[in-house]
Design a protein with these regions (language model features):
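Membrane-interface helix-boundary motifs at transmembrane edges
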Residues: 106-116, 158, 187-196
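Specific aromatic-rich, kink-prone transmembrane helix
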Residues: 143-159
Length: 207
């Protein structure tokens, strides 16, 4: 309960969160009014939400540059009316994703870590710059990281179908994973594990 209040307080008092708020507003406008996320109307709506007014400079413009299918992640959040509450929930989800990715990375590496060291590692995972900043800004990075780490663990354990699905889902943010994905898929093809490629391609096609 105390942790929940802290997250809610942080989401309300902190001026960040532009990445999440833009996509949340884009998703709401798209679902409720059929407004394209790439339109001027969507950009102005997000700007009013974030700045309280439309953008005064090009640097402030809230123009969507992500693939349309990436909005699927934000659809459940469109049910939340209050942007502060929506952002608080999203921050909690991202925090769980960071912790889960950290734990799975321990299994992936085969690191035999003592409980105290693990706790320190998990604390560091959340509160170092590259863990804490995406949580505060609301970036999708932690979720994509969790998908990639899970996919690599599935590859390690020879669950190729699951690995392919997870890699396909990681394309929610293509700029983050494209190089790694191409490398892994070529590795799979040349090592007789083509199902990784097929399931990744199929999942991406469904998106």
């Amino acid at each position: 309960q105390l942790h929940g209040r802290f997250i809610l307080s942080l989401s309300g008092e902190n001026a960040g969160g532009e990445d999440f708020l833009m996509r949340w507003d884009n998703a709401r406008e798209f679902v409720r009014n059929g407004v394209s996320p790439y339109s001027d109307q969507a950009a102005e709506s997000a700007e009013v939400l974030i700045y309280g007014h439309t953008a005064q400079t090009d640097a402030e413009r809230m123009v969507a540059s992500y693939p349309l299918y990436a909005l699927v992640v934000y659809l459940p959040m469109t049910l939340v009316e209050d942007p502060i509450v929506a952002r608080a929930i999203w921050m909690a989800v991202l925090e769980v994703a960071v912790l889960a990715a950290a734990i799975l990375s321990v299994y992936l590496s085969g690191w035999r870590v003592k409980p105290l060291v693990l706790l320190i590692f998990l604390f560091f995972s959340v509160f170092w710059y590259h863990g804490f900043r995406p949580i505060v800004t609301g970036e999708i990075t932690p979720l994509v990281t969790l998908l990639v780490v899970s996919a690599l663990l599935a590859v390690k354990n020879e669950h190729d179908e699951l690995a392919g699905v997870l890699f396909g889902l990681a394309m929610l943010s293509p700029e983050m994973v494209l190089v790694l994905l191409v490398f892994v898929l070529f590795w799979g093809v040349f090592n007789g594990r083509i199902q990784i490629f097929l399931y990744a391609l199929g999942t991406f096609a469904l998106l």
